[in-house]
């Protein structure tokens, strides 16, 4: 759909109907969440002191239990697709049956091969967290189930949708032990892995009875999480800026040389 919109506005600009070609920014789709993944990456770069320090760092992108079974796959897919480009050791962890798009896994594997990193999968949250530098525990819906739901909606089979929802809730409830606990965090690199989340997180004992993360873990990383979230508007602005100029680096250099005050009082 987004590609169709881009084609339409491009044609409108070419035909003189639109004076300018609008920039389309993907704020989230079924496949990817680029603004979130890049905000995550910018946060990681800041925390580890530069992009040159990311090679060999282990990041665990792990499924985690949430009372809501139908969360998008775009965040884990965006993360494994981007982080593998920087030579990181990316581990995708989830219970059996919670696979992501196979096409995205293929992209992640190819990226890791090119960057000198690695991309591995496991059905053990503990294995993923062990000695990890970064952890990203988050719930998502099974890809196969979302395909089935789309088919049912397309056929107008609302009874089938109700039955599928019951099945998914039952499947989801079997994995309440997939949670980011203090015990799991203690197994990470020096017990101090960077905890990431796209927010809002399902916090055990706060927003739900049982959720993705222990309240004590979330509270300890609350300030870094808000910093992580704060990067997103700048990521979006950068995307628009890059789309508007042929040589954005030159534009930024000229703005710096001009010395125009950035803060007006």
Mark where each language-model region is.
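ADP-ribose/adenylate-binding Rossmann-like module
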Residues: 145-209
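Adenosine-phosphate binding glycine-rich loop
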Residues: 188-265
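Short, conserved loop/helix-junction motifs that constitute active-site signature segments
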Residues: 18, 53-55, 84, 183-192, ...
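Glycine-rich phosphate/diphosphate-binding loop of Rossmann-like nucleotide-binding domains
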Residues: 45-151, 155-159
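Phosphate/diphosphate ligand-binding glycine-rich loop within oxidoreductases
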Residues: 1-45, 203
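A short helix-to-beta-strand connector/capping loop
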Residues: 18-22, 110-120, 191, 220-222
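General beta-strand structural signal in soluble alpha/beta enzymes
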Residues: 23-27, 33, 39, 61, ...
